Amino acid sequence: MLQLHPSDIKDIILQGGVIAYPTEAVYGLGCDPDNDTAIQKLLAVKQRPWQKGLILVASDFQQLLAYVDESQLTAEQLEFAFSKWPGPFTFVMPIKAHVSKYLCGEFDSIAVRVSAHAGVQALCRALNKPLVSTSANLAGEDPALTAAEILADFTGKIDALVLGELGEQRQPSTIIDARSGKILRNGQ
């Protein structure tokens, strides 16, 4: 498994690779959100059913506009999300019609976050788009907290490990329904 810095990982992602990378709280698994084959590989590695959907992380909201149907959100709903970003808040937002079922699962919405983590920001800026994100663990197990755990659990299953440090968060992000304001998962 290649171990690379964020600036060196772009080609692997754009060629359909699945990567592990540090986030605010845990290591994540990620891939190109526009490549269904890569998303299916990520789901297989994690042993996660596609119906559950995935999260997109981005360096700014502009990167999410290809996936989120902002016309279904009020100015107040968007302002609330913007007041929490960048940061450890994931918002469930309506999707555009073309979004892959492997991203949104069985829902008509998608979970999105503008990350404050420098490494995630660098990855998304290098790609000029968001990154699929899910915790680096097999379904039902604890997420990886170290590069050593990634190497032990995912060697031969993913294409690269992004070097870097975890952020300061010790809990997963809070998930909020952007339309109703309801907290779906209490995080940090």
From Swiss-Prot:
Belongs to the SUA5 family. TsaC subfamily. Residues 3-188 form the YrdC-like domain. This is Threonylcarbamoyl-AMP synthase. Required for the formation of a threonylcarbamoyl group on adenosine at position 37 (t(6)A37) in tRNAs that read codons beginning with adenine. Catalyzes the conversion of L-threonine, HCO(3)(-)/CO(2) and ATP to give threonylcarbamoyl-AMP (TC-AMP) as the acyladenylate intermediate, with the release of diphosphate. Keywords: ATP-binding, Cytoplasm, Nucleotide-binding, Nucleotidyltransferase, Transferase, tRNA processing. PANTHER family: SUA5 (PTHR17490), THREONYLCARBAMOYL-AMP SYNTHASE (PTHR17490:SF18). It comes from Shewanella baltica (strain OS155 / ATCC BAA-1091). One of its GO terms (cellular component) is cytoplasm. GO terms for biological process: regulation of translational fidelity; tRNA threonylcarbamoyladenosine modification. PROSITE patterns: YRDC. It is found in: Cytoplasm. The gene is tsaC. It is an enzyme of class 2 (transferase). It catalyses: L-threonine + hydrogencarbonate + ATP = L-threonylcarbamoyladenylate + diphosphate + H2O. One of its GO terms (molecular function) is tRNA binding. Its EC number is 2.7.7.87. NCBIfam families: L-threonylcarbamoyladenylate synthase (TIGR00057).
